[in-house]
């Protein structure tokens, strides 16, 4: 949540809970939350800001003081009318891809946008069609979550804090 000036919620990190429970953020006292028309988190926290803070974080509210973070509104891929949240699909891929990677959308004449997977690797090649399914066969993906292409990029663009610059890395392919 890059728009916020301080923490507004906490997520339990220990493993003494179900996977579903481990994904839930609980808001701190004197913080209230809601969502806007896009499904993005809206924060009311007078100790943090006198103004209501609207983020680009897609969330699902699970009670008056808890939410499940889904991803970023600005990374959603609309592929053939299906809205795909890359961060949710990436969770499924993290166990089978050892290199750094991310999912993003590229323009597509038929679908509007197509989901593509970028992997940081020196292979400098592209996989598509059956090759993608074979590469990702161990992932538990729905038919819409399979990327149409896999691009291997030698080195991802990064911020000073080593976060992946998704947009500029995507422009490299």
Task: Put a short name on every predicted segment.
Residues 12, 45, 119-123, 154:
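Short beta-strand-to-loop capping motifs
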Residues 34, 102-104, 150-153:
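General small-molecule cofactor/ligand-binding pocket signal
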Residues 42, 68, 159, 164-165:
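Generic structural signal for well-ordered beta-strand positions
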Residues 53-145:
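AMP-binding/adenylate-forming catalytic core of the ANL superfamily
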Residues 140-163:
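AMP-binding/adenylate-forming catalytic domain of the ANL superfamily
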């Amino acid at each position: 949540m890059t728009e916020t000036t301080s923490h507004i919620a906490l997520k339990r990190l220990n493993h003494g809970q179900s996977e579903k429970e481990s994904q839930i953020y609980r808001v701190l006292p004197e913080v209230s939350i809601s969502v806007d028309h896009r499904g993005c988190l809206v924060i009311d926290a007078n100790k943090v800001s006198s103004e209501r803070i609207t983020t680009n974080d897609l969330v699902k509210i699970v009670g008056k003081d808890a939410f499940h973070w889904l991803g970023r509104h600005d990374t959603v891929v609309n592929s053939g009318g299906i809205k795909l949240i890359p961060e949710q699909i990436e969770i499924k891929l993290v166990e089978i891809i050892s290199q750094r990677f991310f999912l993003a959308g590229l323009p597509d004449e038929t679908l509007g946008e197509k989901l593509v997977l970028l992997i940081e690797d020196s292979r400098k090649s592209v996989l598509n069609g059956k090759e993608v399914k074979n590469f990702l066969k161990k992932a538990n993906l729905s038919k819409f979550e399979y990327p149409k292409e896999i691009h291997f990029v030698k080195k991802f663009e990064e911020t000073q804090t080593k976060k992946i610059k998704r947009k500029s890395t995507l422009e490299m392919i």
